[in-house]
Amino acid sequence: MNSDKAQHILVTAPLGFGGITSMMINIQKNLDRDKLNFDYLVLHDRHEDLEDIVLGMGSKKIVASADDVRNKFLRGITRWYRLYRTFKDNNIKVLHLNGGPSSDMNIVFLAKLAGVKHVTFHTHNAGSAVYRNKISVIMSNAYKPLMPAFVDSFWACSSLAAQFSFPKKIVVNQVYKFIPNGIALEKYAFDLTIREKVRRDLGVENKFVIGHAGRFN
């Protein structure tokens, strides 16, 4: 595979364990990566759990960190500037923003200012703790009406997520694409043979078992 000849889309997703990143990696694994591939924009300059996987698929990790700035206000300003320089210096043409509340539009504004031609806003959130912050509430309400002027494609994981993040006219006119979360369902289909073998291997054949699928972190 020669990923250097592929068209690359810059994706905003942390490279630690998480639902959004897992979805993007599942999609990436099923792409013809000779033609289309993802690069990943991250906001912290550190090694993350899944970055070796995406680097192995021909992706680049692009860092726009402001962690070196101690003052909270200056850190925010610095992050905006470094995001702008990241888009500009890397000649980014297509951005896939994995977001939730419309306050994430800050990144869209910076991308467009830096010359990004196409921005997809992909919402995965039908409600967020961000609404505990009054400033974020004000920003989200102010930004929503501006979204159609700056966002080229609207994607949502559900109708509720679309209602949460997008302007009413985008939702009412269904000017968004419904993208189900990327899960390979066949991997999780019930199999009686596997069930019996695993229970036998664990010595719990005739016992009541409570399982946890997830991470304790």
Located regions from the model:
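Histidine-centered beta-alpha loop that forms part of the nucleotide-sugar donor binding/catalytic region
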Residues: 13-14, 66, 98-100, 123-126, ...
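Conserved donor-binding/catalytic core segment of Leloir-type glycosyltransferases
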Residues: 7-10, 204-217
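A short, charged, and often flexible helix/loop element on the N-terminal side
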Residues: 58-82, 94-97, 128-135
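A short, active-site helix/loop in glycosyltransferases that binds the activated sugar's phosphate group
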Residues: 149-189
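An aromatic- and histidine-rich active-site surface loop
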Residues: 94-116, 123, 127
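A short helix/loop element that forms part of the nucleotide-sugar donor recognition site in Leloir-type
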Residues: 189-204
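Nucleotide-sugar donor phosphate/pyrophosphate-binding loop at the beta->alpha transition
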Residues: 74-81, 118-121, 127-150, 163-170, ...
